[in-house]
Amino acid sequence: ALGVQSEKSGVSVFFANTEASGVIPQISAILGSCAGISVYSPALTDFVFMVDGISHMSITGPRIIKSVMGEEVTMEELGGAKVHSRISGIADFRANNEEDCFLTIRKLLSFLPSHNEELPPIIDIRDDPERIDESLAELVPDDPHKFYDMHQVISHLVDSGDFLEVKKEFAPEIITGFGRLA
C-alpha cells in the first residue's frame, strides 16, 4: 500500500491513482481525520465513503482557519461527512457508523467488475426477467407537467427493487446509482 507519509509530495500516490483510474475500482473510506495533502488522493478515487462524527477531510484545520480568517469552525463544519455529502459532493456515500460504511462498500462492490476487462458480477436475485409491473402506469402521471417520485419508479424497474444510490444528498434533483436489470 502506498502511504502519503512515504513521500512528502504525495506524487507517488497521485500517480498510482491516475494509473489505476478506469482500470480498477478505487474506493476510499475516510474513517478519521484526513488533512493537508492526504485529502487529494481520496478526491481522485471513484467513490468516497464517510462516516458521521468520525470522518473529516480538509486542506487545513480549524486552528489555521481561526488564525488566518478569525473564524471559529469545528472539524464537522469544516470537512465532516455531512459537509462533503451535501455541499462539496466529495463524499459519494455517508454512513451512520463504520459497520454501515463497510456494508455499503460491500454492496457497491457487488455491482462493480474487479477491473476494466471484466463484466460486472451476475447475481441471482430471483426476479422474473419476464415480470411486468402494472403499477408503473399508476406511478407516472399522464400529465408531463406533474411531479412524481422517481425513486419509486426506479425501485419498480430494477430487479427485486435493489438500487444503490450514489451521491444521494448532493444535487438531490439528480438520481445516480446502481441497479440490476435481468
Predicted regions and their residues:
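Terminal amphipathic helices with adjacent charged low-complexity linkers/tails
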Residues: 92-152
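Non-catalytic terminal/interface segments that mediate subunit docking, oligomerization
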Residues: 145-182
